[in-house]
Amino acid sequence: MKGFLLLSLSLLLVTVGSSSQASSTTSSSGGTSPPTTVQSQSPGSSSQASTTTSSSGGASPPTTVQSQSPGSSSQASTTTSSSGGASPPTTVQSQSPGSSSQASTTTSSSGGASPPTTVQSQSPGSSSQASTTTSSSGGASPPTTVQSQSPGSSSQASTTTSSSGGASPPTTVQSQSPGSSSQVSTTTSSSGGASPPTTVQSQSPGSSSQPGPTQPSGGASSSTVPSGGSTGPSDLCNPNPCKGTASCVKLHSKHFCLCLEGYYYNSSLSSCVKGTTFPGDISMSVSETANLEDENSVGYQELYNSVTDFFETTFNKTDYGQTVIIKVSTAPSRSARSAMRDATKDVSVSVVNIFGADTKETEKSVSSAIETAIKTSGNVKDYVSINLCDHYGCVGNDSSKCQDILQCTCKPGLDRLNPQVPFCVAVTCSQPCNAEEKEQCLKMDNGVMDCVCMPGYQRANGNRKCEECPFGYSGMNCKDQFQLILTIVGTIAGALILILLIAFIVSARSKNKKKDGEEQRLIEDDFHNLRLRQTGFSNLGADNSIFPKVRTGVPSQTPNPYANQRSMPRPDY
């Protein structure tokens, strides 16, 4: 009854705009739980009002619930603690629009020793931190925090989730809305074990700060994947960084701006400027020729850097504008042996050097400057100037007459596909081609379309008819000798194998013959010394004959078998 009267008095004082604080504490019987207080405040009031309620049993800390009406400047929070266990307090805080204080909501489950869990949120226009933390009961897991921030705020926003049990370090997920300037990171840690946290950081467009490093809170390793403002966009040409009519050309890790034919890109003006062109071919030494046709490859970018650096250094004191690479082709090697011996390879690069429209440079002065620079260059070997009329396919030998490329006359067999296209190209073949007669129309290096024979055929002896290539030859105009070389090499290899086989057979037979002769000699010696002692015959008088000679004469002394008594056995009787 006393508590009810105190609560009524507190509400009455708040209603009339009193600035004093009223509180009521009610403690239930049993246990040692601390009191629970509930505080509230009416609009316009500057004092704090609270109500504390403590449940019976256990040793749970107090639970507090605080709230604040619009226009107030004090903190509002709501804390609820369940009975039993030793869980830390749980707090829930919220803030109305226009408030400048912190708002949070904390919920803690009963039992275990889990750290507190906090949930904080902030309305648009506030400048304080907003976070949400959720911690499961039991175990010894560190706190888990989730923070978020509305557009326009300048404080940090993070979200942390930690599972119960084990000794895993905290896991944090941070995000930031467009327009903020604070750090954004996302960290995820699995429950249990002692693995350090893994952090993923990202930054929204428009942010100006870099993601900060994450220090592991335990374990032996950490994994961090940063992304955002420090790495730049993946597509270098999206959005297009080139202004005006220029187009963006993307290389491996850089880009450049390319204008229409006869124009160069002025980076200081950020626009295309009309210029004077000087085409030519240079021969360069490169370490690798693979993927030079691919503009996005590393090899092409290295070649582009070498070419542009060479010409920028050569024409640094002139009104030089830009160098454009037209075509890259591999120069034919002198021999296969020299190609294997040389560490570098030669490539031919067709370029166009563009100067200012009112330049005083001529084709002769440009060639002279390049040849002088080649003497001190390490990778550029040669330069050949190309007549401007030949470059565009126009009639004439004077380059000065072909500067107005849209007004020049195309060569016979060449034509412009569009009046605004500067190049004259072959539209039709120079003569009719018939596929049944093994003919085809191809574009030559000079741009002219010509009717030639198909691969494996050639025009022989001035005959216009395509005939099949002789044995061993193939390809265009029968210039491929692969079959002939293969036939010759195969014949030589077969002959060598046959010679080796014959030599092996002869060697084996000679060894067998030597062995048979030795056996025959041993047999002859054995028969020469043989004596037939059992019959009394001997071959000594047979004149080296293997058959014994029989003696027909009467011997002078007849051998007496009883003469030698020692050789005969005696009877025992």
UniProtKB/Swiss-Prot annotation:
Bias (Low complexity) ranges: 16-234
Cytoplasmic membrane side: 509-573
UniProt protein name: Mucin-13
Disulfide partners: 237-248, 242-257, 259-272, 389-402, 394-408, 410-424, 429-441, 433-451, 453-466
Organism: Mus musculus (Mouse)
Subcellular location: Cell membrane; Secreted
Gene label: Muc13
Protein task: Epithelial and hemopoietic transmembrane mucin that may play a role in cell signaling.
EGF-like domain residues: 233-273, 385-425, 425-467
